[in-house]
Amino acid sequence: MSGNNLKMEILDLISSRQEGSYWDFKQEHHKNTANLLHDIICMANNPLCNQDGYIIYGVSDKTWQIIGIENDSSRRNQEHIISQLKSKSFAAGIRPIVRLITLHINEHEIDVLVIKNTMDTPYYLTSDFRDKQRVVRANHIYTRVSDVNTDIDKSADKHIVEALWKKHFGLNLNPFDRLKLLLADKSNWETSEDQHYNKICPEFTLCLEDDDDNGLYPEFY
């Protein structure tokens, strides 16, 4: 997404005067790293919204006024946020992908932390991380439903965790999009005479026919 398109989208979200399933307003940057980590994981583990998440700094979540973060003493840059993620013990070493973008709106700077939508859900830690009295707990699944994050001392409900694993394996996709996902990994396909079937999902089968009219023969890629 271009900077102008992102700016227009953020302005629309501010105009909505509410928070939602994929966006959250913060008047200033997180002072507590555990709170930052918790918010990122919640936004990355969104089972119902198929788009990037936004943590928008410099906008009041009470009045929706653009305050700006140009004088924010707690302001972090992208390198610092990514470094914090890299230093934490995530399951399988897979971490949320983030990007920090600064926008200029109404003579103020606001920072938008973009959390990429991926199929690597659920993201969770394998060891506790503490900053002062706040603890992001190991093996807890945090998520965001509507405009509410899972409490930092709790784990998501069972049906939400199931939805995150379905997203991980592409089980929430329509059949055509799921087929495209399966075709991306040729190693999971077996050949039997004139057809190919997926070893993991054998209900997906490709039947090939020779093109006798032009002398061409099929090749499975």
Predicted regions span which residues?
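Residues in well-ordered beta-strands of folded domains
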Residues: 24-26, 101, 114, 142-144
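Divalent-cation
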Residues: 53, 66-131
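A general structural signal for short secondary-structure junctions and capping/turn motifs
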Residues: 13-16, 46-47, 101-105, 132-134
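Bergerat-fold GHKL/Histidine-kinase-like ATPase
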Residues: 1-67, 71-80, 87-94, 146-221
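Catalytic "initiation/cleavage/transfer" segments centered on a nucleophilic residue
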Residues: 106-139, 145-171
